Amino acid sequence: GSGGIGASITKLRATGSPLKSSFGGSSSGPTPFAKILDTSIRAVQRGGKKVGALCFYMENWHIDFPEFLDWKHNAGDDYVRMRTANTAAFLSDEFMKRVEAGKDWYMFDPAETADLNEITGREFSVRYAHYIEKADKGELRMFKKVPAAEQYRQILVSLQSTSHPWLVWKDTINTRALNNNTGTIHMSNLCTEICLPQDKENVAVCNLASLNLAAHIKNKEVHWGRLEESVRLAVRQLDNLIDINVLPIPEAAKSDRENRAMGLGVMGFADTIEQLGMAYDSEHAWDFADRIFEFVSYMAIDESANLAVERGSYKNFNGSMWSKGYVPIDTIKKLSEERGIAVTVDNQSKHKGLNWDLLRAKVKKGMRNATLMAVAPNANIGLVVGTTPGIDARFAQVFSRNKISGKYMDINHNLVKDLKNMGIWEKVREAIIENQGDISSIPHIPQHTKDIYKTAFTTSPLAYVEVAARAQKWVDQALSRNMYLETRDIDETMSIYTTAWKKGLKSTYYLHMKPRHTAEQSTTKVNKAE
């Protein structure tokens, strides 16, 4: 298919790197090869309606990384620009620590430092220091040296300008991987939520589904019994899907069959907390994220362990961290130890009644699936089912939708319902529409309601980090975490993304800057809320 593909290009030798097979010849670097893929992915369309989707991943010790940062810029030679594919920087803990310490960052030719691509954590740091020593002694053909903070700044300036490259943390992903016995994870996928190892014999495949959290709210409370049923059913459905999958290449079929990886996610988080009367940037919402993701994680793991009893464990189970009785939350401590810096997120259970020790003993006996959870962005299917996408805050309270039948206005039904219950909907309706859904300046609306119905750009960016950090504790793969910023202050942006790393996020997705976004209003006059 032409779905959401991730491609690591870190192994491609540097521009100007000597070729052994060509007398006096040298490599043209990663760009021309990436350009071939960029063009190819556009040529392959799904149903003739949607072009292919690809994200290139590069580790930032590659000497061509500065050129990689320019791939998504509009200006410049089209030959060195990627018009279809996306880009993501695969960053190590060593790099982040060098940024914090004000140290230099060295970039190398992978032809001389190939093992850096395969190692992680402290082992990477030791080997990286070895190559720095060799470079300083003149024992490497080519290298570059820049202040680490300067390169970090360049990454984030590019991110602000083009929304690329997305920031993904290699060591956080690999250190916390419960399927770490099957190799190094070199990349994520298009949407930065999949974390699976891959090599020439195994092309990673993940089978996804998303639960609508908002459909599990009854009388302003979570219907935990119904949610448990949904999680267990989804795990069984995805496991059944693996058995009937028809994949285009044998390497993908092999990986799918031997690892049985799935990624159960959620949508409607913002919709759910609105119904529960919580503001996205409140401690209540963060604790709720902690509890709901812990619950989903527990039930998904338990059902996979049940399936292992019924149908057998996945082929590569023995030797995995699952087989040693680990569950996702246990890897937070492992990450802190590997970094030598404590991950700044609480790793305690928040959901009473879940016996994790009992589940650890159960998991040790067998798991049907190598991975269980991954939170996709769900931008389209969230709209289709009438809820908010993934774990994102609501982008606007009023926006227009384009459908085959035409364009029409959509208003947040939770907001309308609350305002009607207060008896002020008719009084404030026109003001809300005129303000494009921004209710912050409308005097008749109580402050607690304004807090609940903040939109993406009026919500603190640190709230996005905190919600993701609370969820990531329990998720064995990753979360597609969009970020929304009003500020263009680069130091503030650096601080936000550094906080994300410190709190244990594995990845981030698009960065949306406020000046580039407006919610278009429908031209249809709205007299009544549907």
Regions found by a protein language model. Name each.
Residues S230-A253, A279-N378, Q447-K450, S480, ...:
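Internal maturation/activation junctions in enzymes
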Residues G4-S8, G48-C55, Y106, W166-W169, ...:
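Flexible, glycine/charged-enriched surface loops at secondary-structure junctions
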Residues I194-P197, L238-D243, Q348-G353, A361-R368, ...:
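Catalytic alpha/beta core of large soluble enzyme barrels
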Residues D70, Y79-I155, L159-T162, S336-G340:
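Polar, glycine-rich mid-to-C-terminal structural blocks
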Residues T10-G16, F56-D64, A88-F90, A111-I119, ...:
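A glycine-rich phosphate-binding loop feature that marks nucleotide/adenosyl-phosphate handling sites
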Residues V44-F56, A75-M82, Y106, K137-K145, ...:
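Inter-helical turn/loop segments and adjacent helix faces that build the functional surface
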